[in-house]
Amino acid sequence: MEPSSPQDEGLRKKQPKKPLPEVLPRPPRALFCLTLQNPLRKACISIVEWKPFETIILLTIFANCVALAVYLPMPEDDNNSLNLGLEKLEYFFLTVFSIEAAMKIIAYGFLFHQDAYLRSGWNVLDFIIVFLGVFTAILEQVNVIQSNTAPMSSKGAGLDVKALRAFRVLRPLRLVSGVPSLQVVLNSIFKAMLPLFHIALLVLFMVIIYAIIGLELFKGKMHKTCYYIGTDIVATVENEKPSPCARTGSGRPCTINGSECRGGWPGPNHGITHFDNFGFSMLTVYQCITMEGWTDVLYWVNDAIGNEWPWIYFVTLILLGSFFILNLVLGVLSGEFTKEREKAKSRGTFQKLREKQQLEEDLRGYMSWITQGEVMDVEDLREGKLSLEEGGSDTESLYEIEGLNKIIQFIRHWRQWNRVFRWKCHDLVKSRVFYWLVILIVALNTLSIASEHHNQPLWLTHLQDIANRVLLSLFTIEMLLKMYGLGLRQYFMSIFNRFDCFVVCSGILELLLVESGAMTPLGISVLRCIRLLRLFKITKYWTSLSNLVASLLNSIRSIASLLLLLFLFIIIFALLGMQLFGGRYDFEDTEVRRSNFDNFPQALISVFQVLTGEDWNSVMYNGIMAYGGPSYPGVLVCIYFIILFVCGNYILLNVFLAIAVDNLAEAESLTSAQKAKAEERKRRKMSRGLPDKTEEEKSVMAKKLEQKPKGEGIPTTAKLKVDEFESNVNEVKDPYPSADFPGDDEEDEPEIPVSPRPRPLAELQLKEKAVPIPEASSFFIFSPTNKVRVLCHRIVNATWFTNFILLFILLSSAALAAEDPIRAESVRNQILGYFDIAFTSVFTVEIVLKMTTYGAFLHKGSFCRNYFNILDLLVVAVSLISMGLESSTISVVKILRVLRVLRPLRAINRAKGLKHVVQCVFVAIRTIGNIVLVTTLLQFMFACIGVQLFKGKFFSCNDLSKMTEEECRGYYYVYKDGDPTQMELRPRQWIHNDFHFDNVLSAMMSLFTVSTFEGWPQLLYRAIDSNEEDMGPVYNNRVEMAIFFIIYIILIAFFMMNIFVGFVIVTFQEQGETEYKNCELDKNQRQCVQYALKARPLRCYIPKNPYQYQVWYVVTSSYFEYLMFALIMLNTICLGMQHYHQSEEMNHISDILNVAFTIIFTLEMILKLLAFKARGYFGDPWNVFDFLIVIGSIIDVILSEIDTFLASSGGLYCLGGGCGNVDPDESARISSAFFRLFRVMRLIKLLSRAEGVRTLLWTFIKSFQALPYVALLIVMLFFIYAVIGMQMFGKIALVDGTQINRNNNFQTFPQAVLLLFRCATGEAWQEILLACSYGKLCDPESDYAPGEEYTCGTNFAYYYFISFYMLCAFLIINLFVAVIMDNFDYLTRDWSILGPHHLDEFKAIWAEYDPEAKGRIKHLDVVTLLRRIQPPLGFGKFCPHRVACKRLVGMNMPLNSDGTVTFNATLFALVRTALKIKTEGNFEQANEELRAIIKKIWKRTSMKLLDQVIPPIGDDEVTVGKFYATFLIQEHFRKFMKRQEEYYGYRPKKDTVQIQAGLRTIEEEAAPEIRRTISGDLTAEEELERAMVEAAMEERIFRRTGGLFGQVDTFLERTNSLPPVMANQRPLQFAEIEMEELESPVFLEDFPQDARTNPLARANTNNANANVAYGNSNHSNNQMFSSVHCEREFPGEAETPAAGRGALSHSHRALGPHSKPCAGKLNGQLVQPGMPINQAPPAPCQQPSTDPPERGQRRTSLTGSLQDEAPQRRSSEGSTPRRPAPATALLIQEALVRGGLDTLAADAGFVTATSQALADACQMEPEEVEVAATELLKARESVQGMASVPGSLSRRSSLGSLDQVQGSQETLIPPRP
């Protein structure tokens, strides 16, 4: 998160400027002269920091916006009086803003101080706007003066000002600096800018590649169209726009009589849409990526060159560009937004909501308690009254008192009755019956409103009126009852009650107003619809729904600030649009452009339209045409639209989704919190109800209960069972088999992990268990043991049988797709009919077999008890019935034939991965239920309002001058294309709009299309023009109607639909996680562990041959990379420079360049082949790609040469001799077009170069891997719908100018799929729906009866298209989004946390140490390797050596017998320690748990790999951890000696003391440190390091960190932490130890090269190693300084024969195969201090190490060499390995046990190594050490008086004994420095 911190600081500085001025330390001087005492500055400060000042400025900005909006732009720079007045007003605003800026500058200083005016971004914006305003004003004055002197120049000079004046529109942005919540939204958008920039690069890259491909393939193809012969009139059918044609080939032929295909046409969209040059090609590709108008471009290309293959280009473009890359934007924004919101949440918004709920619950409790109390009072009073009557005495019989008593009693009675009655009311209001009554009334109310429609009968209107009044009175009664029963205070506490009250009051008001006639019923009827909101009352008892509604209301706040931002954004662009296009949208062709910028409201609507993306391209084309068409200045207009579209549609609208996803997660957590409470209650009940069970059993029950909610929302078939996992060593079984718990016993189903994205099959490995034969008999005749039944069972469960059936399912599906929908009786269909019979019989046999095996349906486990089997049965039954009924005319049979389409669904039951995706989709649908409900309610409400507003108003006459149906008769004249010479006579028709609001259902349909953003501008303008009922439209009659649509779009389309999408995404992600709920690893840990297990080392090929090496060196150098990068860029530029109609020279040059580039890239390939050899070269996928491209390019060059050679005879086409009818333009070398693509593909190589984009790409490919089953599901969906479409709509005639035409139809399977793909992208799907509904013309070749020409199509189309659109747009495409958001969360993740993307670095650096990719390196290289990898994975080069070693102790990878560590083990250990996976607690237990988890998640992990990564318990393991632990201990010994030598100046010789000090070191310093290290707690260590370094710096003692392997200076930055050569010179080899270079001034003498040849050096060595210091009780102090002290590494052990090589190898061999299992025995035996020394037991599990190892037996040596040399050789070196003598071992083990390292104490090998290290450090022979140790033990025994301590060693007593022994030598212990 570091990168974001400066912005945060900026924000912190910015925000206080307005609200908290006191915080700002004001600079002492402003503008170099004004001090704080200066009166002018004082005044400015007080004004600027005066609260109302801010408000005044905001109001001024607002007024300025209003002024800008009222301005009316006019064509040709005309003006009216209003505009002139506004321009004068402009000066006033300018003055105000200038004064404000000046005062702020005087108050805060201008630039140089910390918080000066220009240091805030918002102020910079203000300043620029003010400055430009002043500058413009000055220029205008200059213009005026000039125009007075030279009148002609005014026009020219005025233009400059107009451009500058456009900047005024930025003023509304100043509102942002005044509203803090806006800044939060903006900041989260700004934070996302970096990852968004990467995505933008990727999009740009795609656009460039596709643009160049388009340029190569479609250049100049769009300029031919059909003209009438001999004229320039384009020949088109009615309603059809002109489109390209082709003279030959499979393009569009000209069919109209007297027309021909010829060139010279500017092209579609006035020549804007084409691929003739790079710029327009990019524009066209970008327009396709936005999924708006892409099918038009595809159809034009089809018309021009035929429809065989252009679809590949466009479909891939949409899939990659729109579905994938643009969804990344969403991933990034939602990630950023969640982070921003989490910060806000930590301030407790969510908490407040929780508390509020709690409070309300408490309050309800109190209220009911108080009312209960009142009732009790009433009861008491009744009893009291009786006693009062009984005991009333006759003495008080005075009349006055009696009268008074009566009043008092009356009041009392009244109060009592009131209380009783009120309590009764309270009970009534709270009862369920009352609730359902109210719901019933609400439903009736809804019904009465929904029954309204156009042309309804009078009685219905009366009925609705009466119902309205009755229901209103009922609602009023309900409200009053509630108020009385609950009391006003409690009533108004509920938000729903307040809302209810508002609705009722508005209803009463409406009734009064209508009755009195003060208001038209229309405006008020909208109020009546508000009553529908009462429907939301249902949510009261529906927890999850009410939580959803609460979270929606909650997100209104965050949405409000976003809406404000959106509104500002729209205003700014609308104002800018008015400046640019105001008054310019009037063209020659008399067609009115509705989306224009001629006034402010209209500009707002146009900008909003572009924002929703509907038809934005046509608005842009108009803008380009307004500036003179597709030539230089006009094209620049597209920049405005592209920026508007990108910022608005991609960024702002995706923030909506981000907010939605965010809030849903919140609603989920609310619901789950409540569920948790319920569970808690249940658990309490359970434990109360289990008196006779033991505690343990209760806990089992509790656990079971805990596991239950996890499965919620998952269908039972998909419940998870934990796989019992067997390993050779241990069996880890589920401790509570499910049968223990009643009611949890499930059917024997194969387990299916539930997840939306099926894992790669490797992880899923579903072992299907054969379901046993059920107990009962099948068909009452076959018993379970019957041979026939057993045989059937065997067949049914055989894999070959399943595969056989799957094959048949596939074949039968293919047969369905191959049918001919038009000609039912064709030969093809007859053949397919026979096949159908075969398939059906096979399926019937399968079902009979299965029923025989499992029984039909009577008993448990029978065939029909499974939903998927019922589906199978249905499909087969349908096939059988339709075979029986032959005639296809019967409508029943038609439906049955269509139902055969469900056959592919049978595959679901057989492909497990697919089955589980389907289940996931069902779960998602179930979970989405709530959202659907809320959305439907809102939709219904808007539909009712729509009916009130627009019923019967969408009629029109095609002759616009006629207003009613009566007038709309006869004929009228039309001028074609506005040309008065061309007249045409047409009949008048009274038309009803396709989408209208005449009744609630039509209204809901119309609104649904609006919510999909398709065709809503047409509907909107239709509504704006609407007049009275049954009247024609009036232009711009009611512009305010736009508000209805805009509110609907924002509420439903932006917000609810996004929440819907968000819900799908959240559900899928949760489903993905449920699979791993009880695996204890989170997603990131899983991904990293999976990477560590699956990764393989890279080969790093370095040639041996010197010449080859030279080539290799060149090819791998970065300069070569940059050179190739530059060449590819050049190649791109050359390709982009081509254009249509280019000159001959240009053609020639581009051909030569192409050859040159091909030669260069071929050379690159040859060089690389030489450098890497074939195996190395083809090992890298990028190289394979290069290779293919080079081969393709060479073929391309050869073909081009042949082509030019044959050009004289007409190119390659003429080889066949058919050249007569080919014009040169047509033969545009199409044969070589395919190979031309290879030129373009070179660009893709750029991807391998850019780091950020490469990571994106990597994740991209990874997310493709996650999609196989999702893709399969989509394929199935498309298949089924395509086949249904062919059966239903295949016979509709293809009519040009309608939506079912030559390019878009259901007549063949591929066409049907393409049409569906078009619908899925939302391209005018509602028009296709209308074109497929009933009453369409039939295809002339189909089999319709005479007189039935117009009977094709069916109204089933409504269900078909709506269901398809819903499934596609909301579910399926969101699966894509969910997968992408899952995989791309790294884009916004905190980079300091280790993630899978960090792990590639490890592979790269490992390859340098292991170039052959053997997967092993010397353990001594590990430390250097890890210090070269940056954190969070490695240690980084600044990590002190000691910390690095300690981390290695914590990582504890297994060490192989040859002294190497493996690749996977090292990577796994790194991941494990970095992410703290099972690092706490007992290490062995943790290892076993982790093994079990890995086996459970990745079932196919080989045991070998698992043992490598986590050795099993029984293993005699040697680990790197122990290796480094001995060195840490040794290092601590040395520090003590060093300290003692410094203190005394000489080295004491008393051996026992030395040994004792060494033991104290182990116990007090080394052991705790190692213990902490192993438990992974390194934070304290690092803090210590830091503290010590600082302390040392203060004292100016430049000491060195105690480095183990050479010295590392922690305070001087190493200039070169590791010279490249050192990769192979192992700095850790102890036989010839290499020191890293030193830079510290402390050491005066150099390090000795070899102690044998240099006597002085030898003396020094002895001196340096001879320093022994004793343990001091001042433990903490020592811990403090243990790291920073001046110490020398002992340079090499090879010098002293006795303690040298042999000893080392001896000690480390002892680390060998003797390990943990004997821990218990050791602990038991070793710690018996009373035992005589000579009886000290040998380390129990250890083979006596004195025996020399047999020849060939492998033992580990720490120098990394195999020790299988002959024993003689060893003795000749004088290094016979010895066991540590018992006394030493005993003492060391005691020390280790006391230090808390029991496991290491139990490891005999480790003890041996430690004792050797002790001897080395003290520079004593092991025998001497043993003698000293024996003395120590004797001394201790004498002190203890030979008293033996029973049992295990008590830490206190042993310490006591040591202390007493030590007391005698107290004088020798030096204090610590």
Curated annotation (Swiss-Prot):
Homology family = Belongs to the calcium channel alpha-1 subunit (TC 1.A.1.11) family. CACNA1S subfamily.
The gene is: CACNA1S
Activity regulation, per record? Channel activity is blocked by dihydropyridines (DHP), phenylalkylamines, and by benzothiazepines.
Residue ranges of the I repeats are 38-337
Gene Ontology terms: cellular component: L-type voltage-gated calcium channel complex; plasma membrane; T-tubule
Protein's name in the database: Voltage-dependent L-type calcium channel subunit alpha-1S
What post-translational events are described? The alpha-1S subunit is found in two isoforms in the skeletal muscle: a minor form of 212 kDa containing the complete amino acid sequence, and a major form of 190 kDa derived from the full-length form by post-translational proteolysis close to Phe-1690.
The answer, when asked if Membrane is one of the entry's keywords, is: yes
- This protein's species is Oryctolagus cuniculus
Renumbered to this chain, region (Phenylalkylamine binding) spans: 1349-1391
Q: Which residues carry this modification: Phosphoserine?
A: 393, 397, 687, 1575, 1617
Q: Which residues carry this modification: Phosphothreonine?
A: 1579
One BP term from GO: regulation of ryanodine-sensitive calcium-release channel activity
Q: Where are the II repeats?
A: 418-664
Compartments (UniProt record): Cell membrane, Sarcolemma, T-tubule
Q: Where are the III repeats?
A: 786-1068
Q: Looking at the keywords, is Zinc present?
A: no
Record topological domains on the Extracellular side: 71-85, 137-160, 219-279, 302-309, 452-462, 515-523, 582-601, 624-633, 819-830, 886-892, 951-1000, 1022-1038, 1141-1148, 1201-1231, 1290-1311, 1331-1356
